[in-house]
Amino acid sequence: MGPVTGMTPDKNIETPAAEKVPGLSQTENMGSLPEEVGAARPKASMVDSGTTDEELTNLNWLHESTNLLNNFSLGSEGVPTGSPLYDIEGDLSPSGCQTPEKLSASSKPPYSFSLLIYMAIEHSPNKCLPVKDIYSWILDRFPYFATAPTGWKNSVRHNLSLNKYFQKVERSHGKVNGKGSLWCVDPEYKPSLIQALKKQPFSSALALYTPPTSPTSVSSRSSVSSLSSVEEVYEFIPKNSRAGSDGSEGFHSEDDTDIDYEEDMLGDSGYVSQPCINPSSNDLHGNKLRKEACQDIDDELKEAAGSLLHLAGIRTCLDSLLKTAKAQSQKHRK
């Protein structure tokens, strides 16, 4: 019995020593392993305060990363808000957020097609232009459209015909032989166009890059004077030649108007009923448009009729199958 009791303390003494060795090895390994290993062993008895300090440091790093979010929010202050005058084709490009000095002559202008048309019409002496003269004004002021896809002309025509800000007017008696139609700005919606024009990116840099003006000019800019607003825009619009702009923005000769008459698709589209000078050509063009519209409607009706017949056939088959199944079920019951 004596040796038995003597061995018991020895085992008790050796057992803690055996437990301390793995414990020390665990703490040494934890100091060298990444912090994820320490987080995966929450029940370890020998975890020191250094590991918790490292974890807190990581949390502080995450807290400091909010400065990056602040930088992103500060960098987005210069982006203008959306406007109903921004049509589909007139989306703001990245170059639209730059200052006027950084805008190159070949960069995309930060204006919608509605505003481009408005500026072109207001710069003309008679405040009305045909479609081809609007093209010429845009090409003179913005060389970007000289190499842009030709679809921008379709966008101009669509804005003229479908936009409520513009209306078709009758040619004066001095231009009896002229073809096509003239377009002007509806006075009812002119204040909306002026307000949208002042919200463009150039307005924020207007006070920095324009020559000092008198208080009267500042008050006139806030009024509903379309001419003053348009002239402010011209200070930042890239031009190929400013000297010849005044003479080229009026009415062109009759020969020039006849050459580009085919491009004036809106001249006789009939969106606004106005007296016409040449009824024969208008009748021919109107008949052609009506025939094309009728052809499209006939094709759509044929497709719809075919779909209805197909659905009717499916419904008939389903009804016959239901009747057959019902008759068979009644026979089985009998």
UniProtKB/Swiss-Prot annotation:
Keyword Transcription regulation listed: yes
Localization annotation: Nucleus
Alphabetical list of Pfam families matching this protein: Forkhead
Alphabetical list of InterPro entries matching this protein: FH_FOXN2, Fork_head_dom, FOXN2/3-like, TF_fork_head_CS_1, TF_fork_head_CS_2, WH-like_DNA-bd_sf, WH_DNA-bd_sf
Primary location group: nucleus
Source organism superkingdom: Eukaryota
Protein name in the entry: Forkhead box protein N2
Name of encoding gene: foxn2
